[in-house]
Design a protein with these regions (language model features):
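N-terminal signal peptide c-region/cleavage motif recognized by signal peptidases
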Residues: 16-17
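Acidic Gly/Asp/Thr-rich repetitive segments characteristic of extracellular carbohydrate-active
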Residues: 24-52, 56-58
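Flexible, charged surface loops at secondary-structure boundaries
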Residues: 21, 41-45, 62-63, 92-93, ...
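Extracellular beta-strand/beta-solenoid scaffold signature
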Residues: 81-90, 110-118, 133-142, 161-171, ...
Length: 308
């Protein structure tokens, strides 16, 4: 057989070979991998990483595609105190990753942006994850075609403004940020959600400062971008860092299209001794602010649009 025919035959055999089966990698005491970082080094595309209950003083970098990282329970599986690459407890650079049933806590780095998750891939789903006492809960890089979906999760006592401000969720220039049925509480000085996404959707969430929370805005879209905020509950507390608004749009200049702004069927309460606004719109897009229930010294809209 000539070398060319041999090469072609080998290529045909490779093409006909079945795909490598996805594996489940088990992490924990007595498991094949003692720490999440060990599983991260061994995992391949399509694998599932199962982390047993316990407290792991560890961090991990996940470059794999189509990966699922899952704890045994939302409260019982805790990743804490370490930061990989000077960034986060979990640095996720692979596309199509799901993180589920974990607590990510106490992320700190010298630049002030230590995150529970640093999202650097194309598609990330976060499901039933608690982010507690981090500088950033989730911090993403720019990925114009990317999306982040957060659902049924909890962000508590995140945020910092020691250097640059860090937030509960800070989305860079991505295609879509969607947050569903998620609770934000006691955010420190910064915003619960800061999003530079082309489209941001916040549905069925709660934002509570309480008596001691010092959050600035519940939702900020500093560069514009479309917004749907529906069926949420907002409580702006007496120690809020910024009294101007609950939702702020365009505070750093409009640099991307804002196709629509819809804020509807929310409940908003201002508990402080100050006046505030539900939606502060600095774009030329007319905001639709409707069906919201307001209490305390709060008005529905400043800027272009209509309130009903």
């Amino acid at each position: 057989m000539t070398p060319i025919r041999c090469l072609l035959a080998c290529l045909l055999l490779l093409a006909a070979a079945p795909p490598v089966a996805a594996r489940t990698l088990e992490v924990g005491p007595g498991k094949p991998y003692a720490q999440p970082s060990q599983a991260a080094a061994a995992a391949g595309d399509g694998d599932r990483v199962m982390i047993a209950p316990g407290e792991y003083f560890d961090c991990a970098v996940w470059p794999q595609n189509n990966l699922t990282i899952e704890g045994a329970s939302e409260e019982g599986t805790v990743i804490t105190d370490k930061a990989c690459q000077g960034k986060a407890l979990f640095v996720i650079s692979g596309p199509n990753v799901t993180v589920r049933n974990l607590t990510l806590t106490r992320a700190r780095v010298p630049d002030g942006n230590g995150a529970g998750i640093r999202a650097e891939g194309k598609t990330l789903v976060v499901d039933h994850v608690r982010f507690i006492n981090n500088q950033d809960g989730i911090l993403s890089t720019d990925e114009p075609q990317g999306s982040i979906t957060v659902r049924d999760s909890q962000f508590t006592r995140n945020g910092a403004c020691e250097k640059a401000c860090a937030h509960g969720i800070y989305a860079g220039h991505i295609g879509l940020l969607r947050v569903e049925r998620t609770a934000f509480s006691e955010t420190r000085r910064a915003h619960d959600i800061k999003s530079r996404a082309l489209r941001t959707e916040v549905v069925g969430c709660t934002f509570v400062d309480g008596p001691d929370g010092t959050a600035s805005y519940a939702i900020e879209l500093p560069n514009g971008g479309s917004l749907l905020a529906k069926n949420n509950t907002f409580e702006k507390g007496p120690k809020a860092e910024n009294h101007t608004a609950v939702i702020m749009i365009g505070s750093e200049g409009i640099t991307q299209p804002t196709r629509e702004i819809v804020v509807e069927d929310n409940t908003a309460r201002a508990d402080g001794d100050y006046n505030t606004v539900l939606v502060y719109n600095q774009t030329a897009t007319e905001a639709v602010v409707q069906g919201n229930r307001l209490s305390g010294p709060i008005t529905p809209l400043h800027g272009d649009g209509s309130a009903s």
